[in-house]
């Protein structure tokens, strides 16, 4: 039997102002200052009184105005509070009165008790709000609905867990009725059913009330069971199970399915290829494609328990291509888009749900907003730290349409999510949305790149929970403290300190923007090949890593330890990457010195032995990290994509093993007075450079040469429609054939091996594009190399023609005139050789350069971080 025990000690006002409870560092202060309590989200109103309390929850509460089934549902969560152990005050008088938990308006005596302390709040708490009274006379949780009582119990749970010992009055309600997390499970990590249940439990405690998933192909409907990956999917019965589980925690699961673009995964399955207008876009006019969408969306609508369904339909880059070209040419892109969305709207409405859709296309084509049904909810997304979010709200707010703001947590092509950007974006977009009557907040977690763990995202999830419940910026100062006590049961600040120490790597050139290019780059070149390594800022990075290590080692969580393990892993991963680069360069230098001097002395043998040991130690560290990551992945995710994310580990381990074997062979040759082979021949073709080589480009082609001896005369396309600087996914046209511009990142430190990317038979033309943003007008020296003929263009002007160098070490120098703003760089390369075609490009060393993908910035006055 549960028993409530309350102990009360009266303290003077002067004593109160200097008293912390439970030695946890929570200082009692007046309301409307920087006062705080260990609750997240921070309540809208709270006020401490003079009583100091010690209480435990061991008795069933007195239920007021609740049906039997509602009592049973809430009792499940009440018992979770009762299970918490905490310290009570010594020498306190014991009081055994019970908590009263009830619905307002059902019991006059209960209403009167609540009104004595909180009459001014009763009409403000809304459907999801609650009132919590905790003092010597009253132990009350009151609300107008069952879900409000649930949220009141969650607040009590957090107070109890933190060892709260003050009399307090809380009146609380959400700023937004709809507070959702949207988790990407289609780019690699797809959570297990058990882990999703843990997500539900933890999110519900912080008053998140909707969970959804970004789904392209990882759902297995009964009508079409053959497109989902065998080892990574959610089945319809599993979704129903999860919906029922979410309902126990007063949450709902929102169905989501990409219903226009981003369809490549399904269309790549042979039996579904005919449904595509292009390789990435499902046909909006094919009856079989429409039937497919009706089937899949229908099953999903019935399985997900929320009253909404999100059809996505963002980034429809191919609309107007393939089989949609004639239709778009005839009707216009907005009409074709709107017609497909109206079809989807009818499907959703048939299943009794409200349609959600992304807002990027309507922002670019506002006329579509006047073509679509008015009950659609638009999800307008922007993930950057912007000074204003008006651009992303105005098209919807000005028309009084239903819309929700969608900030983001971006793992996207990063080593760890950028929590500086995420925190500012979530807070800024949410506050802007509150002012412009947005109806909800949906934080979208993106995993492009695929090698991520959700346990690295929780800080951003808690920022979402707080910002969507309470938009008051005065709560920001205490957020980190409340986050730690509620996530980890700690008061030392060390997780947050470690997290934001690691975030300092955003500013260091070698780790700029937390880009995962550092991890994807080859550790060692192939035999006979070369790898460029720039270690100029390596020691700066190591200092930051050491700071983060110090904090994470002292975190000492009492719960949710996987968050700490994931951050700790990221720190270890950064350390081994930086140290590997330094050690490999040193070993390559050792070997080159031995080779050039042809020394067979004992000193050379000793040097090689030492280098072999260094390689062996590195190998063991990579093997250990691989095992650690694999276990962490399987703790959260299904088997799907694990082989892909382990591949960089395996390549590094294999390369190190091969190098150790080659070094041992060289050692034996020296011992036997034999000659040794070149560094390049054993995989040590390392070139250390202080230059910033451009590693990220957009490529298109290969265009067949046939009888053409000279480069095509056009810049970007031989048709006016496409002859413009490209964005990812754009097309170019050559001799009547379409080619797509694709993102490319060098794994060789800036040596772009076109034969690896385009192994098609030569000869052919390949185009490479990037842009360079400059804050001022300037002229800079550029250095380029290519073992094939190359032309260089800057802002449409040819600055070098028919250039060819002996190898990547030999460069030609050209002057580039940069205007203020965006400068377009285009390289045209003629790929003649069947097995070898490379180029490099860099600017003079005294220029400070940063980049995000193919977008480069010169001498930035302020650092910018791209939200992609």
Residue ranges and their predicted role:
Residues 48, 123-336, 342-343, 347-356, ...:
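Feature activates predominantly on carbohydrate-active enzymes
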Residues 13-147, 151, 155, 159-171, ...:
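Acidic, contiguous N-terminal accessory segments
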Residues 28, 32-49, 54-55, 64-67, ...:
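Substrate-binding groove of N-acetylhexosamine-processing glycoside hydrolases
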Residues 15-38, 658, 662-751, 828-868:
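Accessory carbohydrate-binding/adhesion or oligomerization-edge regions at the termini
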């Amino acid at each position: 039997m549960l028993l409530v025990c309350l102990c009360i000690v009266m303290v003077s006002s002067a004593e109160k102002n200097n008293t912390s409870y439970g030695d946890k560092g929570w200082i009692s202060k007046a309301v409307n200052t920087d006062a705080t309590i260990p609750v997240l989200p921070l309540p809208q109103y709270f006020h401490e009184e003079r009583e100091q309390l010690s209480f435990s929850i061991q008795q069933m509460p007195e239920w007021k105005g609740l049906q039997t089934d509602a009592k049973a549902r809430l009792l499940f969560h009440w018992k979770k509070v009762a299970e918490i152990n905490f310290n009570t005050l010594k020498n306190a008088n014991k009081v055994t009165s019970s908590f009263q938990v009830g619905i307002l308006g059902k019991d006059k005596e209960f209403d009167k008790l609540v009104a004595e302390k909180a009459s001014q709040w009763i009409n403000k708490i809304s459907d999801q709000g609650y009132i919590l009274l905790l003092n010597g006379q009253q132990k009350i949780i009151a609300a107008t609905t069952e879900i409000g009582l649930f949220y009141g119990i969650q607040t009590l749970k957090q107070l109890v867990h933190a060892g709260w010992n003050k009399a307090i009055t809380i009146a609380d309600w959400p700023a937004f009725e709809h507070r959702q997390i949207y988790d990407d499970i289609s780019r690699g990590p797809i959570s297990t059913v058990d882990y999703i249940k843990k997500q539900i439990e933890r999110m519900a405690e912080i008053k998140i009330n909707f969970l959804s998933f970004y789904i392209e192909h990882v759902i297995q409907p009964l009508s079409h069971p053959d497109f989902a990956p065998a080892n990574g999917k959610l089945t319809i019965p599993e979704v129903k199970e999860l919906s029922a589980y979410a309902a126990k925690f007063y949450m709902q699961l929102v169905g989501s399915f990409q219903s226009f673009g981003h369809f490549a995964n399904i269309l790549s399955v042979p039996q579904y290829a005919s449904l595509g207008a292009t390789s990435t876009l499902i046909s909006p006019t094919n009856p079989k494609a429409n039937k497919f969408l009706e089937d899949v969306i229908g099953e999903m609508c019935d399985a997900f328990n929320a009253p909404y369904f999100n059809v996505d339909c963002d980034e429809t880059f191919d609309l107007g291509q393939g089989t949609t070209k004639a239709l778009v040419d005839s009707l216009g892109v907005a009409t074709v888009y709107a017609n497909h969305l109206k079809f989807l709207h009818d499907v959703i409405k048939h299943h009794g749900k409200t349609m959600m859709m992304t807002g990027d296309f309507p922002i670019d084509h506002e006329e579509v907003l006047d073509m679509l049904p008015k009950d659609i909810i638009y999800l307008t997304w922007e993930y950057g730290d912007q000074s204003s979010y008006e651009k992303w709200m105005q098209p919807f707010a000005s028309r009084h349409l239903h819309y929700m703001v969608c900030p983001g947590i971006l793992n996207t092509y990063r080593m760890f999510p950028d929590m500086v950007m995420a925190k500012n974006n979530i807070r800024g977009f949410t506050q802007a949305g509150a002012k412009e009557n947005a109806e909800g907040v949906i934080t979208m977690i993106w995993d492009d790149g695929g090698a991520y763990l959700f346990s690295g995202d929780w800080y951003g999830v808690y920022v979402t929970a707080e910002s969507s419940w309470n938009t008051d910026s005065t709560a920001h100062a205490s957020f980190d403290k409340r986050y730690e006590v509620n996530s980890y049961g700690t008061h030392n600040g060390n997780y947050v300190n470690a997290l934001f120490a690691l975030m300092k790597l955003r500013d260091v050139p070698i780790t700029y923007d937390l880009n995962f290019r550092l991890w994807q780059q080859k550790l060692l070149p192939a035999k006979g090949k070369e790898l460029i390594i720039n270690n100029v800022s390596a020691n700066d990075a190591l200092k930051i890593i050491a700071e983060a290590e110090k904090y994470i080692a002292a975190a000492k969580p009492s719960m949710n330890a996987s968050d700490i393990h994931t951050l700790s892993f990221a720190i270890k991963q950064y350390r081994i990457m930086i140290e590997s680069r330094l050690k490999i360069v040193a070993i390559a230098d050792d070997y080159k010195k031995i080779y050039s001097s042809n020394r067979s002395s004992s000193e050379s043998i000793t040097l090689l032995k030492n280098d072999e040991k260094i390689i062996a130690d590195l190998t063991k560290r990579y093997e250990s990290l691989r095992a650690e990551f694999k276990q962490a992945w399987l703790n959260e995710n299904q088997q799907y994509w694990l082989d892909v994310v382990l591949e960089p580990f395996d390549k590094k381990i294999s390369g190190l093993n091969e190098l150790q074997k080659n070094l041992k062979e060289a050692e034996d040759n020296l011992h036997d007075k034999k000659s040794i082979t070149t560094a390049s021949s054993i995989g040590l073709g390392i070139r250390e450079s202080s230059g910033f080589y451009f590693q990220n480009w957009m490529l298109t082609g290969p265009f067949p040469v046939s009888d053409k001896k000279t480069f095509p005369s056009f810049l970007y396309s031989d048709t006016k429609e496409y002859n413009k600087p490209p964005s990812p996914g754009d097309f170019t046209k050559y001799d009547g054939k379409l080619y797509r511009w694709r993102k490319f990142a060098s794994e060789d430190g800036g040596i772009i091996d076109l034969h690896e990317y385009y192994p098609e038979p030569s000869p052919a033309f390949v185009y490479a594009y990037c842009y360079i943003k400059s804050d001022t007008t300037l002229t800079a020296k550029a250095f380029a190399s290519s073992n094939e003929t190359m032309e260089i263009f800057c802002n449409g002007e040819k600055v070098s023609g028919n250039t060819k160098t002996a190898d990547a070490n030999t460069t030609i120098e050209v002057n580039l005139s940069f205007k203020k703003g965006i400068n377009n760089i285009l390289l045209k390369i003629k790929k003649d050789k069947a097995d070898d075609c490379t180029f490099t490009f860099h600017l003079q060393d005294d220029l400070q350069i940063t980049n995000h993908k193919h977008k480069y910035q010169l001498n930035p006055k302020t650092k910018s971080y791209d939200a992609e």
